[in-house]
From Swiss-Prot:
Entries under NCBIfam families matching the protein: PorD_Arch, PorD_KorD
Gene: porD
InterPro entries the UniProt entry points to: 4Fe4S_Fe-S-bd (IPR017896), 4Fe4S_Fe_S_CS (IPR017900), PorD_KorD (IPR011898), Pyruvate_synthase_PorD (IPR053389)
The name this protein goes by in its record: Pyruvate synthase subunit PorD
UniProt xrefs under PROSITE patterns: 4FE4S_FER_1, 4FE4S_FER_2
Subunit structure: Heterotetramer of one alpha, one beta, one delta and one gamma chain.
Cofactor detail note: Binds 2 [4Fe-4S] clusters.
GO MF, one example: 4 iron, 4 sulfur cluster binding
Domain 4Fe-4S ferredoxin-type: start-end pairs: 25-50, 51-80
Organism this protein belongs to: Methanothermobacter thermautotrophicus (strain ATCC 29096 / DSM 1053 / JCM 10044 / NBRC 100330 / Delta H) (Methanobacterium thermoautotrophicum)
Length: 81
């Protein structure tokens, strides 16, 4: 089976309803560790990470997939304050 990569251009399926308030943990990127592999962008189910690796916290639900898929552990999940 062949797979095709894709990214979501707009965050979330409901642009009008910001869903970031659902989070318990949020991803925090250490840009010094980042190797620009773009796994975080490709695997984010909400499309909350842009090409500059900025995270749109208005829509990020804190699922942690970006941190899990980062090969150099440049993304850490931190508890919301």
């Amino acid at each position: 089976m062949e797979s095709l990569g894709a990214t979501v251009k707009k965050p979330g399926s409901t642009v009008k309803n910001k869903t970031g308030s659902w989070r318990t943990f949020k991803p925090v990127l250490d840009k010094d560790k980042c190797i620009d592999c773009d796994n975080c962008i490709l695997f984010c189910p909400e499309g909350c990470i842009n090409r500059e690796h900025e995270i749109d916290y208005d829509y990020c639900k804190g699922c942690g997939i970006c941190a899990e898929k980062c090969p150099v552990k440049a993304i850490k999940m931190e508890r919301e304050k």
